[in-house]
UniProtKB/Swiss-Prot annotation:
Any one biological process term the GO annotation gives: translation
Pfam families: Ribosomal_L31
Stored PROSITE patterns: RIBOSOMAL_L31
Coiled-coil ranges from the UniProt annotation: none
Name used for this protein in its record: Large ribosomal subunit protein bL31
Domain of life from the UniProt record: Bacteria
Lineage: Bacteria, Pseudomonadati, Thermodesulfobacteriota, Desulfobulbia, Desulfobulbales
């Protein structure tokens, strides 16, 4: 391998939005994540709705007329 062309690899703490920290190796200096294994519904067994910026409501408003027409027909 050629010298002095590879990024520096070091240990960092990845911080989740729930506050959980995981130590891992990366070329980045810091890492922030929204969901980790401590708060993800698959790993916790708890169902929780994660709706960023009202996407579900926007979808329902956009397609409400379409679904009403199919129900009437």
């Amino acid at each position: 391998m050629r010298k002095d062309i590879h990024p520096e690899y070091h240990k960092i703490n990845a911080v989740c939005a729930c506050g959980n920290e995981v130590e891992l190796g990366s070329v980045e200096t810091e890492m922030k994540v929204e969901i980790c294994s401590a708060c993800h519904p698959f790993f916790t067994g708890k169902q929780k709705l994660i709706d960023t910026a009202g996407r579900i409501e926007k979808f329902k408003q956009r397609y409400a007329k379409h679904f009403e027409k199919k129900a009437e027909a």
